[in-house]
Amino acid sequence: MATLKDIAIEAGVSLATVSRVLNDDPTLNVKEETKHRILEIAEKLEYKTSSARKLQTGAVNQHHILAIYSYQQELEINDPYYLAIRHGIETQCEKLGIELTNCYEHSGLPDIKNVTGILIVGKPTPALRAAASALTDNICFIDFHEPGSGYDAVDIDLARISKEIIDFYINQGVNRIGFIGGEDEPGKADIREVAFAEYGRLKQVVREEDIWRGGFSSSSGYELAKQMLAREDYPKALFVASDSIAIGVLRAIHERGLNIPQDISLISVNDIPTARFTFPPLSTVRIHSEMMGSQGVNLVYEKARDGRALPLLVFVPSKLKLRGTTR
């Protein structure tokens, strides 16, 4: 069975582009030649959407999952990390024969009364929690967890990753490390920054003035890095919270005329496809974000099937991939 990923690889485009072309997204700005190539490949591989497969087979799904994304849909275009999570959800639902409804919180929830379970991707608002719990108690958070919530969760051990990056730099003889990151809530540090600051101070390699926080975008990374580099004294080793931010940081460093990694080095998180093609290629922590989506589906499905009462927290594996932005 062909998948969106198969089409994206053969067409040489991103998953986001394939998804938007096949869904006839009117806001997509792409060459007609590219659209035709994607459609031809989809036809050649006999790709069918999940709804088309259901019509063709006449199958009736016993399970129905509602996936709610607590962010703007545009974020999937700017950060492939989130698109990969959604792709993992969609692929696993197709594999298990589960009916799936996707929706974005800001667009409102669909009028669905009977669901097997709900996946919430990203940190939920209190209103979203209340709406979801009114539909079912089989809820799984993805890319977020909260001890004591009573719900399943699939997440990344970001605190461990932050410590791993600090230890890597310390083993290289670095005695001052900076941080450039984003925030999920205005004025509030995310777990990467919190763990970085706490562990870095313990190891005496972090200063308060070397912590920079903005948004999770390349433009934010660019602006923050420019501000940092404008100072006479700045850290020569950086932990950047995501690859998307790091792309902007790289641009600011290049514009400053600095050599990477001789003058300044950096490590980011996610290992998006673009990370291998930056200049120099990004050293980054690979996150199996597609697995986060598929494992979320598995937890909801397994709880519905077996009646498990205790909530589970699953951390997906990660691996530091050293490339050209570190010594």
Curated annotation (Swiss-Prot):
Residues 1-57 form the HTH lacI-type domain. Residues 4-23 bind DNA. Keywords: DNA-binding, Repressor, Transcription, Transcription regulation. Gene3D superfamilies: 3.40.50.2300, lambda repressor-like DNA-binding domains (1.10.260.40). One of its GO terms (molecular function) is transcription cis-regulatory region binding. Signal peptide: none annotated. GO terms for biological process: negative regulation of DNA-templated transcription; regulation of DNA-templated transcription. Repressor for beta galactosidase alpha and beta subunits (ebgA and ebgC). Binds lactose as an inducer. This is HTH-type transcriptional regulator EbgR. It comes from Escherichia coli (strain K12).
